[in-house]
Amino acid sequence: MHITHITPECAPFAKVGGLADVVVGLSKELVRQGHTVDVFIPLYPFASHHLPPLSKMDESCCFAFGGETVVCYVYKSIYEGIQIYLVDLHSTSNFFHRDRIYGYEDDVRRFLAFVKGSLEMISLVKKNPPVIHLHDWPTA
C-alpha cells in the first residue's frame, strides 16, 4: 500500500516534541512491512542539514491563498527507505523561512498553506495514495 504523511515534524529533520518521533517510527515500520511511504514536511531552513542530498522536483505549482499567490516547489530525498518531500512555499508571507517550527501568530495560516501546497503537489504528480495521514493540529 502507498501511504503519505503530511506533517509539521519528522525526526531528525524537524523536531520539537514526540510527533517527530512518532512520524519517523511509524514510517520506518510501514516500510519494513513492505509499504511505500512518503512524508511531506515544510522546508524549514534547518531541515536540510539532516538530510542526504536533495533533488528539486521538476514540477511546481502556484495557488491563490488569502489574497496572495503562493508558489510551491518541492525537494525530495530518501531517508531509511522513506521518501521525504520538503515543501518550499514562496509568498509575501514568508511562511516557513523562519527560525523555529511553532510559536508564530500566523501558525494556523502557515500550516493551512503547507497542507494546500502538499495536496496540490500530490495531485500534480498523480501520486493518488489510498491513505493520506494528516498529523496533529497543524495539518488536520
What are these model-predicted stretches?
Residues 1-76:
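N-terminal subdomain of nucleotide-sugar transferases
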